[in-house]
Amino acid sequence: MTPLLELKDIRRSYPAGDEQVEVLKGISLNIYAGEMVAIVGASGSGKSTLMNILGCLDKATSGTYRVAGQDIATLDADALAQLRREHFGFIFQRYHLLPHLTVEQNVEVPAVYAGLERKQRLLRAQELLQRLGLEDRTEYYPAQLSGGQQQRVSIARALMNGGQVILADEPTGALDSHSGEEVMAILHQLRDRGHTVIIVTHDPQVAAQAERVIEIRDGEIVRNPPAIEKVNVAGGTEPVVNTVSGWRQFVSGFNEALTMAWRALAANKMRTLLTMLGIIIGIASVVSIVVVGDAAKQMVLADIRSIGTNTIDVYPGKDFGDDDPQYQQALKYDDLIAIQKQPWVASATPAVSQNLRLRYNNVDVAASANGVSGDYFNVYGMTFSEGNTFNQEQLNGRAQVVVLDSNTRRQLFPHKADVVGEVILVGNMPARVIGVAEEKQSMFGSSKVLRVWLPYSTMSGRVMGQSWLNSITVRVKEGFDSAEAEQQLTRLLSLRHGKKDFFTWNMDGVLKTVEKTTRTLQLFLTLVAVISLVVGGIGVMNIMLVSVTERTREIGIRMAVGARASDVLQQFLIEAVLVCLVGGALGITLSLLIAFTLQLFLPGWEIGFSPLALLLAFLCSTATGILFGWLPARNAARLDPVDALARE
C-alpha cells in the first residue's frame, strides 16, 4: 500500500549563533490514509517541528517528504499554501480562533482562501457546526465559548475544505477531562469517516487511543510500530470544496478581503478613528486649500477686473517720463475715433488732465481735473451714487458740467443730501455737478488726491485750450486676447502717425502677475497641506506596522489554513487603503463644512467643489493607503507561518 505521507531521512536544523542546532536527525516515516497516529515525546524532542513539516508549514533542511507522491521540495510558497488549504486541517492546543470573528466566520476562513462562494461557505459551515453540536453558537464570538466549544470550532475549521489529513497538536492539552474525552471522540469519528488523524501529544492516555504510537526522542524516532493495514475505510473522507475559477474567484476573493479588512478595523474602533484623523486633516486641508484658494483667487481677479484690468492705456512719447516736446501732441481726437471703430474695442475714452483748484462757497481744495468721454466710467467699471455721466450733446457742446468723486463730494458738500445741480468753480470756470462716481477700491491702496471729471471737449477747449489728448484708454472686449489687441492697436496708430511716437501700457499684465502670484501662493499652501497628508500617511504606516506585530499569530493562523503570501499582502494593503478612503471621505465632508461656513461669513465668495477636486481627493486617499500601507503589508506577507504561530 502506498503511503499518503512519506518521509525519508528528514533533517531540520536551525542557526544558533555561528552553529547549527539539529532538531530532527534523519526521520524516516510512512503514514497511510485512514490511520490514526500519535506522535509522542518530551518537550524539546522535536515532535512539534515534525508536525510543522508534516503540515507543510515548514520545510526540511534535507531529506525527502512526499504528500500523495508529490515531493514538496519542488513546490513554491503558493503551491504549499494550496496543499495546506486542500489537504490539511490543523487543530491547535490553544484553538487559535480569530477573536474578532464569530464562530461561523472562523469556520469559513479556509474556504475563503479556497475561493468558495459565500452561500456555499455558509451552508458548509452550518453543516459542520451542527454535526459538532454548535448550531446554537454560530453567532457567538470565541471569548463567549468554553474551551471545549472553542476546540470543536477549531475542528470544524479543520474540516471546512475537506481535511483529508487532520493534524492535532495537543488537542486536549488545554481542556478538562470531560471536554478532552469529547474531542477525542470526535477525532475517532473522523478516523472512522476516512480522515487521516495525526495527534502530537505528551499525554500517554491520549496517545494510547491511537492505532499507532510513534515515539520521538532527541530528534530521532525510537519507536515506530508497523502500520495496521486497512482493508476498508468506512464512509470515505469529507467532500473537498468545489471552488469557482477565473474572474469570479478574483472578485469574490477581493470582496472577502475587503470584508475581513473592515471587520479587523471595526474590532479596534478607537485606534482606527485616531489613525484616520491624520488622513481626515490632510485631505480636508488639501481640498479646502484647493477649493477655497480657487474661490479666493477668482474673487481677487474679479475685483481686479472690475477696476479695469482688461484695458490698454496709450500715452505720447517713448516711455514713462519722456517729456520730449515733439511727442507731446502725438495723440489726436481722430485717433480716438479710429480706435473706437475697431471690432475688439468695447469702449475707448480720451483723457486730458490738469491739477486745478475747486471752490464752493468758502471751501477751497486742490484736485485733479480730468477731461474724459462718457465711456470713461464704463471702462473703469465705476458706478454712480448720484446723477449720471456725460451725454453726447454735452460732449459736442463743451458743456460746463462736472462729475465728482465721493471724496470731493464729502469735502465740498459735507452736509448736503443731494449735490446734483450744485455749481462749483473748476479753476476759474463755473461747472454744474451732474453726478457723483464711486471709484473701485484698488488693492494697491487709494490716492489722497481729489478727482473730478469734465467732458474732454470742455477740458481741452475751455479750461486748458489744447487740441491734443494726454492719453487714450481702451477697454478690450471680453474673450479677446489682450496681447493681440495691444499689437493691433500699435499697428493702427503707427500707420496713422507714420511712426511710433507713443507707447502702450497693458493692464492685463497686472492681472497675469496677480494670477501667477496667487497660483504660487496656492501651490505653497497646497504643499503645506500635502505635508499634513504625508504625516497622516506615516501615522497609518506606523499603526499598520503595530497591527502586523499585534496580529502576527493571526497571520500565522491564516497561513496555516491556506492563505498565500499574496492573500496576506492584499488584506493588509486593503486595510490601509480602507482607512485612508474612509478618512478621505470624512476629510472631504469636513472640507465641505469648512467651505459652507466660510460662505456664510464671506457671501461674495463663490465656493464650488468640482468633480476633479473630489476625484483628486479620492486618488490622494487611495495613493496614500497604497504608499504607506505597502511596507506593513509586505512585512506581514513575509512572515514565516511557524514563527508567526509561535508568537504570543
Swiss-Prot record:
Disulfide bonds: none annotated. It is a multi-pass membrane protein. ATP binds at residues 41-48. Pfam families: ABC_tran, FtsX, MacB_PCD. Its EC number is 7.6.2.-. The chain crosses the membrane at residues 273-293, 523-543, 576-596, 600-620. GO terms for cellular component: plasma membrane. Residues 5-243 form the ABC transporter domain. It is found in: Cell inner membrane. InterPro entries: AAA+_ATPase, ABC3_permease_C, ABC_transporter-like_ATP-bd, ABC_transporter-like_CS, MacB-like_ATP-bd, MacB_PCD, Macrolide_Exporter_MacB, P-loop_NTPase. The keyword Membrane applies. GO terms for biological process: response to antibiotic. Homodimer. Part of the tripartite efflux system MacAB-TolC, which is composed of an inner membrane transporter, MacB, a periplasmic membrane fusion protein, MacA, and an outer membrane component, TolC. The complex forms a large protein conduit and can translocate molecules across both the inner and outer membranes. Interacts with MacA. Part of the tripartite efflux system MacAB-TolC. MacB is a non-canonical ABC transporter that contains transmembrane domains (TMD), which form a pore in the inner membrane, and an ATP-binding domain (NBD), which is responsible for energy generation. Confers resistance against macrolides. This is Macrolide export ATP-binding/permease protein MacB. It comes from Shigella flexneri. The lineage of its organism: Bacteria, Pseudomonadati, Pseudomonadota, Gammaproteobacteria, Enterobacterales.
